């Protein structure tokens, strides 16, 4: 990534960041088991007489994206920030792999305004800041090959001609329209500090929308012979608030400064499913 920042006229601060990231992960795992050890002191398959099995798993996935951030601060009073990501993942079909996730925030430090000077002194106000933000994120919480019909293999449970042959199993049902689960959050908050920053408080209220949740879709009939795949099948709305209060101070104890801090936090939230296949809903 590259970063640029510049201060001009003593009161204007500007920063910009632009970057690129790519992550690739390859996994190759091997496992073996055999039941009925002759002695637990020697845990080796050679000293077991029961059923045995061998497993192997190979997978590969990648994520590629670009990101940016722009900050502008005027006189430490007015703060603006914008962010964005454009990400793609191999976990989704080619036509649905990429998504853009923007975010932004604004803040106003009211306590730094000139008309607040007398008020700050009279009540011991050190900082009062109002802020608001909007943010979007993407979730790719599905299997590496969830959109592809893959066949698995393994030894069957029956013995034929003195051994357990290997079988190849038919693929299950897949969704060919998988894409990013999008989470959008709108937040508003207040930060407060008093008494030489010994007492501080913070309050946030937020509404979060989760769209295209990656979950199982409508239940398929049992005669279909396969379980339902994960799709972008549901939407969720969450509303909540968070409040924190903190007191920190110090005093002399045995000729040494003793620092302490007390913090109280309260929070509440409620979530509602706003979209999901439910034929029994009235």
Locations of regions flagged by a protein language model:
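Extracellular/periplasmic, surface-exposed regions of secreted and cell-surface proteins
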Residues: 1-282
């Amino acid at each position: 990534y590259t970063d640029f920042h510049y201060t001009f006229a003593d009161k204007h601060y500007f920063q910009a960041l632009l970057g690129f990231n790519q992550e690739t992960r390859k996994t190759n795992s091997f496992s073996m088991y055999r039941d009925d050890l002759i002695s637990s002191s020697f845990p080796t398959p050679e000293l077991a007489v029961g059923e045995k099995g061998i497993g192997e798993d190979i997978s590969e996935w990648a994520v590629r994206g670009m990101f940016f951030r722009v900050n502008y601060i005027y006189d430490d009073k007015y703060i603006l920030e914008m962010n964005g990501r454009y990400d793609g993942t191999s976990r989704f079909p080619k036509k649905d792999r990429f998504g853009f996730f923007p975010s932004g925030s604004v803040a106003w430090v009211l306590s730094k305004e000139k008309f607040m000077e007398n008020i700050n002194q009279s009540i011991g106000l050190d900082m009062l800041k109002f802020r608001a933000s909007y943010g979007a994120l993407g979730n790719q919480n599905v299997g590496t090959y969830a959109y592809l019909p893959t066949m698995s293999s393994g030894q069957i449970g029956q013995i034929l001609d003195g051994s357990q042959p290997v079988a190849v199993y038919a693929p299950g049902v897949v969704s060919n329209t998988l894409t990013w689960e999008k989470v959008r959050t709108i937040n508003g908050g207040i930060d407060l500090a008093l008494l030489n920053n010994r007492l501080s408080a913070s309050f946030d209220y937020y509404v979060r929308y989760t769209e295209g949740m990656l979950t199982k879709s409508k239940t398929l009939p049992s005669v279909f012979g396969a379980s339902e795949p994960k799709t972008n099948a549901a939407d969720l709305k969450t509303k909540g608030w968070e409040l924190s209060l903190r007191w920190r101070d110090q005093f002399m104890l045995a000729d040494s400064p003793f620092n302490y801090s007390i913090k109280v936090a309260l929070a509440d939230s409620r979530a509602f499913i706003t979209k999901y296949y439910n034929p029994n809903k009235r």
